[in-house]
UniProtKB/Swiss-Prot annotation:
Coiled coil: none annotated. The keyword Heme does not apply. Folate-binding protein involved in regulating the level of ATP-DnaA and in the modification of some tRNAs. It is probably a key factor in regulatory networks that act via tRNA modification, such as initiation of chromosomal replication. GO terms for molecular function: folic acid binding. The gene is ygfZ. This is tRNA-modifying protein YgfZ.
Amino acid sequence: MAFTPFPPRQPTASARLPLTLITLDDWALATITGADSEKYMQGQVTADVSQMTEDQHLLAAHCDAKGKMWSNLRLFRDGDGFAWIERRSVREPQLTELKKYAVFSKVTIAPDDERVLLGVAGFQARAALANLFSELPSKEKQVVKEGATTLLWFEHPAERFLIVTDEATANMLTDKLRGEAELNNSQQWLALNIEAGFPVIDAANSGQFIPQATNLQALGGISFKKGCYTGQEMVARAKFRGANKRALWLLTGSASRLPEAGEDLELKMGENWRRTGTVLAAVKLEDGQVVVQVVMNNDMEPDSIFRVRDDANTLHIEPLPYSLEE
């Protein structure tokens, strides 16, 4: 990507975030084009893409035959096919898996590094963008296209926008917003996704979890009414037989070091500590607070106390902005 990522600053929680323009270099774009695009994706991901309109974006999972996620995808219609955004660390293996059956279909599946991914979040993000685009996405119309640019709208943890555009427009936006907006890198968007409860699947956790273990059903990412797709049997069994015992949790507190993706945490049991869970992502905020996204048993007590392994500091559960009640 010729567009240079912005230098890192410590991320800020959404409630205190000033207007910020963010380069999403840890995320990557991929596309599927061709006459069979919709049919092909319908047979590969958990969401019902046949029901998707031009105005929607969805979080969907791409699973293996056992229902474990290679990746999750932020999916939207693009040209005569679809585009999706996922963590850069999983894009190459995810595309390799997706292409396995493509020889039988009229589709072209490819990474897209020509376009640039930017985020706009923080104080009066909408007002800042209103001067630059003729229409902005909203709750009713979550995707807006203008020229070479696609804008995606997110409600949580506070209104924010993801911009998929060409290099020239990315440079124009940077020039226009540089004076009023702070600039930051992917860590800020990651912090917002953790706060929003959007599961982050990096390479360390690819092929490890069924979608429901990361709350995808609560985020509208799984259709239980659509036809066959890879891994469907296991995903359906987890719902209808209650086979899923895990959920995605948000923890905050302090830690002397950031836990890495794939690492476990420790849960306080009386005087002792017991290993539990798998970390998906963690970020340290500018106020020193640590936010951790972790998959654990879905019956954790809300007042449970956790820590990074052998650490002197503790973490506790924060509520997510959505419900897991079915």
